[in-house]
């Protein structure tokens, strides 16, 4: 199902890429865009996860550098019957997290230092279980490729404003006007595609994550805290790369941008209500939280030296 959705998504974004190419350079531009899109689709499949992690300066951690956090992810992955993903930490004060990778065998999960410092252990476990649910559902392939291609569409459309608007070839009857329109409409269209695949997927990952960690209310509490932090603490890397916003557990954009009018996430209050309903259905089912024995800190390394982590 997710592979079919990914194929449809790639076809749609490739078609949009070609439309932008036609607006910039007529039929020749459209053919060039087709070739570029084909190359991008292949490149995105293999390398988009590394690009996204690089955008946010994520650093990989292990049992030596972040023993408690990595042990928590390992236990959650065991419960989810998943291979152990790579674990990353992003030095960013906004509490947030995402997962990436083309399949469960090549997956990675990333959390910000803000998340590790803001949430308690049960809430962190709920968030990471949510991200592992994305991995289990193969959502990470769709999310990562969407981020890569949607960002390229926006870049190409803006490029057309400066270099394509003057094209007056007979095979492009719309000329500079179409380049201007594409610069405005293409990023919006790409964002609409992101919205179409994101909303139901988040509900599914919330439910799957709650079942993995066994604590729906801990995840609900985490969502409330993350949403408050996302509004209060700007994420400048996300503001510079809005095409990746749909990858995070909560929209990282501050709301000052037009992008936030086209939210890639369902309403947080609705997600919390759904988790509360799930908690009532699960009744007294509360397995022990996924945490390791006390150690020197949940993520290790030096995050500034001024604050201890929730388990340190």
From Swiss-Prot:
Subcellular location: Cell inner membrane
Biological process (GO), any one: proteolysis
Enzyme class per UniProt: hydrolase
Cofactor(s) the record lists: Zn(2+)
Topology within the bilayer: Multi-pass membrane protein
Binding-site positions, Zn(2+): 130, 134, 202
Superkingdom of the organism of origin: Bacteria
Extent of Gly residues compositional bias: 298-312
UniProt feature coiled coil, ranges: none
EC number: 3.4.24.-
One Gene Ontology cellular component annotation held by this UniProt entry: plasma membrane
Keywords of this entry: Cell inner membrane, Cell membrane, Hydrolase, Membrane, Metal-binding, Metalloprotease, Protease, Transmembrane, Transmembrane helix, Zinc
Location of the region described as Disordered in the Swiss-Prot/TrEMBL record: 287-312
Active site: 131
Name the record gives this protein: Protease HtpX homolog
Organism: Azorhizobium caulinodans (strain ATCC 43989 / DSM 5975 / JCM 20966 / LMG 6465 / NBRC 14845 / NCIMB 13405 / ORS 571)
Gene: htpX
